[in-house]
Amino acid sequence: MIYILEGLDGTGKTSFASELIKSQVFSRPMYVYFSKEDSYENTKLAWVSLIKELSKLNFNIIMDRSIISTIAYHFTYRPSKEYENFIRSELESVLNLDPSKAVFIHFVKVHDSKKLLEYANRVKSIRDNYHLLMRILREKGFNVIVNGGQKDFNLF
């Protein structure tokens, strides 16, 4: 199973992943950090290649971010049907995940707001993008768990 941790900076994704690995809930977890900083086109290529390889593995994988973060951070949210269709189209072309083999955990509560300073003027747009993306993922049959942070470690 691939567990994908998503959400704004400072919401506890990396801390959660570290605790999950230390807890030994999974016998052989693999941790993958996926940066949101590269260009969108480079990130799409890297994502498609990464997922192709990870899909061959037969153990639990914990991903700290995914192509979802790249979409959320790179595009300015617009509340229109055209924008939603654009996002749907992007997901169709790059996601390459089987809903029965992936779980998205959406971290929503910001614990370290200093990490958001770099994006201060875009936080609402990024958050709105995440909400749209998670809704679309649910519609596609993915299990999306909303997580408030470290206190919700008992998900596993």
Swiss-Prot record:
Pathway(s) where this gene product acts: Pyrimidine metabolism; dTTP biosynthesis
One Gene Ontology term from the biological process aspect of the record: dTTP biosynthetic process
Positions bound to ATP: 7-14
Record keywords, A-Z: ATP-binding, Kinase, Nucleotide biosynthesis, Nucleotide-binding, Transferase
Reported function: Catalyzes the conversion of dTMP to dTDP.
One Pfam family here: VapE-like_dom
GO molecular function: ATP binding; dTMP kinase activity
SUPFAM superfamilies according to UniProt: P-loop containing nucleoside triphosphate hydrolases
InterPro entries: P-loop_NTPase, VapE-like_dom
Annotated S-S bridges: none
Catalytic activities: dTMP + ATP = dTDP + ADP
Protein EC: 2.7.4.9
Record-given protein name: Putative thymidylate kinase
Coiled coil regions in record: none
Family to which the UniProt record says this protein belongs: Belongs to the thymidylate kinase family.
